[in-house]
């Protein structure tokens, strides 16, 4: 599941959604009960007025805290690793601790930061955002050192100033104990750029991908196979295997007509700017992200832009068909979100999950 800790309001259509820890924990506990394997939330650093709603919880802390109130689900904390700067010892110690708290159910989503305003919030001068590919080089060096701290049996010394990658931290006789319980925690990143794919192929176990064709399920099914093959091949060249996950919003009711009416009601409640329906009220900050370009390509069939990277709309049978189609083209898993999260998640569990089990997509 893909949680909403940022209080993003896609539409004025009524919803129970809340940014609060209690609401999101209830969603994760329901997902845990249904047998979902993974819970995750994005993280953003925006100035006043940058969010649709009133608040944004820290995803690193919130997902880690959920470990004490869940049983089986894996919890993925998001962290911008280049803001601060972050020292490898901090991340290694925090990660090992959360690994023990969760009994091996914790992992980290590595984010390098694509918005200029976020880099400036942490002290970069205007125009001082770290160059796109350089960010991945710096993050890779950080993860190399963190992995060493998790694995080494002796003290570690390292000087990043000598590598020329742009990091400025040093370690002299560094040591982290206890080590993670079951080896290295799961590492995740979201990307669509060549540099991001190269990073994922070296470090990640899971990569969150986006549809090159935009949000409509037909365009996604048409354009994703080549994208998936590129990512898998990059990992295979390094004798690694990585899983690809995509983020659909599931809009479902008992009948196709009811589901379409629900999706239309969400769309009609979207705010407008200059007569054009927009996604929530978020401002358009300067970003060099490359993963969402498909939404701007008019040659592809576009969706309603009501949440998620792609949209799965329909009756339970239709939703199961679309998830099965994603599986057939090579998607390893889906990180689902919902407009009215908890009620819609319960609908998924009671009406759609049994169909996926019948098709061998769930156990």
Regions found by a protein language model. Name each.
Residues 1, 39-41, 75-77, 106-110, ...:
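Hydrophobic faces of well-ordered beta-strands that scaffold small-molecule active sites
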Residues 1-72, 180-185:
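N-terminal beta1-alpha1-beta2 module of alpha/beta enzyme domains
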Residues 8-22, 79-89, 129, 181-194, ...:
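Active-site mouth loops of central-metabolism enzymes
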Residues 22-43, 199-210, 325-331:
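Catalytic domains of carbohydrate-active enzymes, especially glycoside hydrolases
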Residues 31, 35, 66, 98, ...:
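Conserved, mostly hydrophobic/aromatic
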Residues 38-60, 211-224, 336-349:
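Glycine-rich, proline-tolerant flexible connector loops at the mouths of alpha/beta enzymes
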Residues 87-119:
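Hydrophobic or amphipathic alpha-helical targeting/insertion segments
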